[in-house]
């Protein structure tokens, strides 16, 4: 197994765990109404965005594990990595009012860099797979 495949598998496992955590946080936030204190009137929007981002992360994690194990199927991980990066940017923009509207969401920036690294590893595996065929 190449280094790119090993790295993609680790990144995909992290995605999988983060996806489950996002879904749990969104679910608990909706049920308990605890997101109101953080996001105020945008609480339901934040919960919906968090749930959608969790589903995308979960799907990217599954596709990444699948692609790391079987390189011919890594295209799904590549595409879901792009969707995850877009979803992270959307989450940062939609939850910006919670930070006063003028703050920089450094957490979202770090996650976008992580998303791009995931995409790059999936692309490397696609290139390796092309070379082998």
Each language-model region and where it sits:
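Membrane-cytosol interface at the C-terminal ends of transmembrane alpha helices
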Residues: 53-69, 109-126
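Cationic, hydrophobic amphipathic alpha-helical membrane-interacting segments
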Residues: 21-27, 66-72, 93
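A loop-to-helix transmembrane entry motif
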Residues: 39-56
């Amino acid at each position: 197994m190449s280094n790119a495949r090993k790295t993609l598998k680790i990144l995909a496992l992290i995605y999988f765990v983060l996806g489950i955590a996002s879904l749990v946080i969104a679910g608990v936030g909706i049920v308990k109404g605890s997101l109101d204190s953080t996001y105020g009137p945008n609480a339901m929007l934040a919960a919906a965005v968090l749930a959608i981002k969790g589903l995308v992360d979960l799907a990217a994690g599954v596709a990444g594990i699948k692609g790391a194990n079987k390189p011919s199927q890594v295209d799904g991980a590549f595409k879901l990595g792009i969707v995850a990066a877009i979803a992270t940017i959307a989450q940062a923009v939609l939850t910006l009012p919670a930070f006063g509207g003028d703050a920089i969401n450094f957490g979202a920036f770090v996650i976008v860099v992580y998303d791009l690294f995931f995409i790059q590893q999936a692309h490397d595996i696609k290139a390796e797979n092309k070379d082998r065929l």
